[in-house]
Amino acid sequence: MNLRSAAAGSPRASRRPEAIAGYLFIAVPVLLFLVLNIGALVYAVYISVWKWNLRTGPVTFIGLQNYQDALADPVFQTAIKNTIYYTAVWVPLTMILGLSLALIVNQKLRGQTFFRGAFYFPAIASSAAITMLWIFIMAPDGLFNGVRGLLGLDPLFELFGYGPHQNWIGDQRTAMNTVILLNAWTTSGTFMLFYLASLQSISNQVYEAAAIDGASWWQAFWKVTMPLLRPGHFFVATVAVIGGLQLFDQALIGGGVNGDPNNALMTMVLYLYNAAFRQFNFSYAAAIGLILFVLIFSATLVQRKLFGTAPEW
């Protein structure tokens, strides 16, 4: 047998057609990713340093002027503050709610499937429809004010300056917090599923060992469950921060294109939307998008550093 025939009959040679077929299958998705994601990012960087016209394309090279104008704009500064505040409050609140719901439905309870579906339902409902419903609920004559009046809670709310006909989403003091509560309700079901998958990946042997050592439920949760959920925490926190920094539809529906009242609901993505599709200043909008990209990327790196990896047992 010569070397050529031996090579032809080797396992590596026999797997070569399968490898080629595999590369052909992934070629189209990889190409689309490079064009639609990496290509779009590179092009955004390119047009952000030009005075860009919708009809003629790049006209005048202006360097970092778009970035300087954006960072000097008081409205954009407000948008950054609102976006960071929303993310800083909404992310931990929703993670706590999601984990709490996951712990509940992870138990062997009667009607477990029903509760899982009920908790998850707001996440699959139309965001626009739920936001409109929430606006009616939180209106001056809405359900929330009516219920707290029936419960005799008006004096308590008046201590904080909120009258019996408080317009929660129309007041600069409460508008963003109202949106935070809305999104905590609608997205906690999704995070519940993420945490439920992480909880079910933990071996029962770990809990049995903790029980033998005399650990209480709280000790087992804090010393066993929480450390083993680090990868789950990282995934949920990353998804949440990316979503939080891109808050748009609820802010647009609740406060209009100007983020009313008084820019209380102005976010970075809403500001970007106005620059691109109301002012048609696409180079300026590209600069805003890249600032948002840097913020999201930096937040992801910080979370990776904080959560690290799960311990070995």
PLM feature segments, named:
Residues E18-W313:
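A structural signal for multi-pass alpha-helical bundles of membrane permease subunits
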Residues M1-R16:
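Short, Lys/Arg-rich, polar N-terminal cytosolic tail immediately upstream
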